[in-house]
Amino acid sequence: MTINKRAGRSVKKNISFYIISIILTAITSMIIVAAVSTGRTLTKVVRDFVDEYKAEDAEFVTYKPLTNDDIEKLENEYDVILEYSGYKDVKVESGDLDGATIRVFAKPEKLNLYDVRDGHEPGDGETLLTQDFADAHNIKVGDEISLGDHSYKVSAYTTKADYIYMLQTFTGFIDNEKFAVMIVDRQEYDKIDAEETAYYSIKYNKDNSKEVRKRLNKDYVIASYMAATTNTRISMPVNEGDAVSNMATMFAPVMFIIVLTLIVMVLGRNIKSEQYLLGTFISLGFSRKQIVGHYVRYGLMPGVIGSVIGVLTSIPLTGLLCTFYIEYDFETLIYKPTYNIPSIITALVLPTLLYCAAIAIQAGRLLKKAPVDLLRNTGKETKTIGIMKDSHAKTQIKMRVRSVIGHPGRSIVTI
């Protein structure tokens, strides 16, 4: 009998355990990598878009209007970007878009900018349209849409920096069939006969928001002020990536530890049940290092194979999760999934390392015993569980209680 042949027979004997171990390891590694990578992708995609297209830090309304000179003076004095903003809600009451509300913006110049996809900037009689609404109504670039008194040719699709999360009202919900954003040039905007909702958008280049607000309230009297952190259209997508990452860092390690502990416990028990073989190996002249190395191989298979499978399957899973969050929760954004390297390294290395370390420690402890005790299988430590020793309860009840309380580690992991 060679030590290598014995390893092969042991794996065949416990093949179901190794298959389950590989599956559990793969699932755990897959979830860790996919969840962390999805969170990082969401955060990067949204923050990059918000930064590139200059989403506001706050919006406010004042009782006294700001003139262009006032805006320029405040920008120079406080190092801020300030812009008058406004929109007109057009309720469509006929045609294919009957019942929809279209929020029309004039093209912004400084803040809350927009991207242009699959087309060009709007000119006379043209408009940009948010893509989720367009997809819901099968509207293509080049098609013409009617808003009652006015018709526009869709020149391109767009996403506006302050409307990534497409809410008509802050307390409402997303309805891609009934609400959309359009962006037209100033001349087309002025032609629309609808009430304008006006406000000011501001972006701070340094940490002086309190000082600026104090000045605004003193000179113009602030009627309302809403920071971007409380603006659901901006804060929801910005925070969702962090929320996914936080959930991944909280729950994935717990699952990881539970699965690893279960597998390590079973591997350790398998070695204990075969301790007579350790005595045989010693008698055959194998060194302790060779014996430990032999048993370490038992941890390599589920660790390496499971981790590799888990990391490979995490690639398509990350793509699916990104699609779920970005394409179903947010207005259309151009993105490419990014994979978190530290989580990949952890998923590849940690399971194998822990499996092998646990087995090596267990084998090392057993090898400290006398070879004769190992051969006779008397090297196994036993202890008497004295729980309910003097109780008059039925023996069956005593045994059940002792099986739980007498093995606290196993019971905790099972729970």
Regions flagged by a language model, labelled:
Residues 264-269, 274-276, 300-333, 341-368:
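Small-residue-rich transmembrane alpha-helices
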Residues 1, 367-385:
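Short cytosolic juxtamembrane segments of multi-pass membrane proteins
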Residues 140, 287-288, 370:
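Short coil/turn motifs that cap or connect alpha-helices
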Residues 142, 285, 310:
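Conserved G/P- and acidic residue-centered "switch" motifs that form tight phosphate/ATP-binding loops
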